[in-house]
A protein has these predicted regions:
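Short linear motifs at protein or domain termini
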Residues: 1-101, 106, 211
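Short loop-to-helix capping motifs
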Residues: 36, 145-146, 190-191
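Hydrophobic packing residues in well-ordered alpha-helices of helical domains and bundles
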Residues: 84, 111, 128, 132, ...
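Hydrophobic, amphipathic alpha-helical faces that serve as interaction scaffolds
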Residues: 87-103, 133-170, 206-209
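C-terminal all-alpha effector/ligand-binding and dimerization domain
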Residues: 7-8, 112-119, 157, 164-211
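Amphipathic alpha-helical dimerization/coiled-coil segments
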Residues: 94-119, 125-127
Length: 211
């Protein structure tokens, strides 16, 4: 049997990921104009894959395309932020309720282990962000609804545009950890209603801190 030929990752997808990380790291600031010519020269590519990459980021809400003006890094308004957090609260609390009711003991132990890692990262903001996101995404994987997963992934990309503000509030990391403990306690008790409530409260408090 002949070997299967795998198509390498498209160039525009690689460029999209590079730009995505620069946006998340604030190298490309919210509201800033994206200089296509400069970036194309920097990456040693033509403007075609760069424009395709920008289209991808536009569909994710990270970039805003303006007629005859080009691409700009999206600025998240208070309304945008409230809408994103509202949807995430609905989607992720629903997933959390499913996990509380249906997860295996091994899966709950895995989430508990991630929570322990979160506790250790309290003094390291970036590490806390990383483990926090891992916990939320693993919970979604266990809930096992690929349509919900895709919606959450896109919403979380927009949320990252404002994520640094969410933990700048004094004591917010400790508050977030306490909220995670409440979620974890409800999960381990297999109390779906309490888990849903705890996750919704987590996002409500997160929005208040980020606004």
């Amino acid at each position: 049997m002949a070997a299967v030929s795998l198509t390498p990752r498209a160039l525009y997808e690689e460029v999209a990921e590079l730009l995505r990380q620069r946006i998340f790291n604030r190298e490309l600031a919210p509201g800033s104009w994206i200089d296509e010519l400069k970036l194309a020269e920097e990456y040693g590519i033509s403007r075609t894959p760069l424009r395709e990459a920008l289209k991808v980021l536009a569909t994710e809400g990270l970039v805003t395309m303006k007629v005859r003006r080009g691409a700009y890094v999206t600025e998240v308004s208070e309304r945008d932020l409230a809408d994103v957090y509202h949807l995430l609260a609905l989607l992720e609390s629903d997933a959390a309720g499913v996990v509380a009711a249906k997860a295996s003991d091994a899966q709950l132990k895995e989430l508990a282990a991630l929570h322990k890692e979160l506790e250790k990262a309290v003094g390291q903001r970036e590490r806390f962000f990383e483990i926090n996101e891992t916990f939320h995404m693993r919970l979604l994987e266990i809930a096992n609804n690929r349509w919900r997963d895709q919606m959450v992934a896109d919403l979380r990309k927009v949320m990252k545009l404002n994520r640094h503000n969410s933990l700048l509030k004094s004591g917010r990391i400790q508050e977030s950890l306490a909220e995670h403990q409440g979620i974890m306690n409800a999960l381990l008790a297999r109390d779906a209603a309490a888990t849903v409530q705890a996750m919704q409260a987590h996002f409500k408090n997160g929005l208040e801190a980020a606004a």
